[in-house]
Amino acid sequence: MSKLHLYGWLYRDSDKMLCVGQNRKPNILRDKNIIEEIEKIAKIKVDTTEGLGGRRTYIPNARMRVYAIDDVCNLDEAIGSLVDKLYGEMFTNVRNTGYSEWTITGLHVEDFRIGGHDLNAELDRYIGQYIHFILEYED
């Protein structure tokens, strides 16, 4: 499986798109739009009759994880903070503030939905926090 790993401070840009940046203050020239980054790796287009019909971007066999943390950290520290929150056996310098995982047979990129989950709404609760966003998919 291949992996897309985005990390940074989560916010919405002026177009209300979810982005991650390395500073708390947004910088649209450097920061990454999550949906645009996913579209770069999506290779499958499917026909649809929804709305006006046409073709939509779709990633089969997708698995997504989001770690939300109170401060800048690497992925290992983010995972450690979740373990610490659940079991109290790890000592980390950051505090886990949220975790979500979705394993469904496909990700609809334009709608930003996986299964019946609206990822825009799901990720809204992490706005303003440092996140590690991981999408694993088959090539």
Question: Could you say what each language-model-derived stretch is?
Answer:
Residues S2-R125, Y130, L135-D139:
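Short beta-rich binding modules
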